[in-house]
């Protein structure tokens, strides 16, 4: 794949090591947490432990492409309509099937990163593992300040007000005790942007 030509295995290994390092710090933070009950804390630790890391580019093409075909004589509109119908048919067949956690939701060349609560995974395509975000020539401190901040940000989505609704398998399932969920909601309100105002205008930010 094209992305494979843009990122060395050493860079993939280096950023993967950074992910493991930051995940370890998340575990330390959870261990030292003072407001979560042991039951919820244990489930949060399990969610971290089962989080999958996708780095650089997918090892195989998305299986959807095995089901797409057009005729050489098709005009553009006909080809688009055929591909659209084939894509819809593919997704309908996925209903009720086990989730393929190895499937990527973004291409390897994309300059972005993501956390998927439905799979409990974080994805770092080759596109974002390039300057000005990352370089093997930079110091560890520089890479932690750039890519490391992005890694920490994406992991945090697993415990934000949306990610917290899903368990370690990506199921929409409440894994919080009522008291812990109430405490979490109160802490979320404390950092809500709705409480911030621009002093010059008195408008909410």
Stretches with model-predicted labels:
Residues 1-7, 198-205:
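Short, small-residue-biased leader/transition segments that mark boundaries at the very start
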Residues 9-197:
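Intrinsically disordered, low-complexity linker/terminal regions across diverse proteins
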């Amino acid at each position: 794949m094209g992305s494979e030509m843009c990122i060395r295995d050493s860079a993939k290994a280096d950023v993967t090591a950074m992910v493991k390092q930051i995940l370890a710090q998340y575990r330390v933070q959870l261990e030292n947490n003072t407001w979560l009950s042991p039951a919820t804390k244990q489930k949060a630790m399990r969610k971290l432990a089962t989080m999958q890391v996708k780095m650089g580019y997918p090892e195989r093409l998305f299986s959807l492409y095995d089901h797409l075909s057009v005729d050489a004589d098709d005009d553009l509109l006909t080809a688009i309509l055929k591909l659209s119908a084939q894509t819809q048919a593919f997704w309908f067949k996925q209903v009720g099937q086990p989730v393929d956690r190895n499937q990527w939701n973004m291409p390897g060349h994309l300059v972005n990163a993501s956390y998927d609560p439905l799979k409990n995974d974080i994805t770092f395509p080759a596109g974002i593992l390039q300057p000005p975000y990352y370089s093997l020539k930079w110091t560890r401190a520089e890479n932690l300040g750039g890519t490391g901040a992005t890694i920490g940000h994406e992991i945090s989505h697993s415990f934000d007000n949306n990610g917290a609704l899903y368990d370690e398998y990506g199921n929409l399932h409440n894994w919080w005790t009522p008291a812990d969920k109430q405490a979490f909601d109160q802490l979320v309100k404390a950092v809500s942007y709705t409480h911030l105002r621009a002093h010059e205008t008195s408008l909410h930010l």
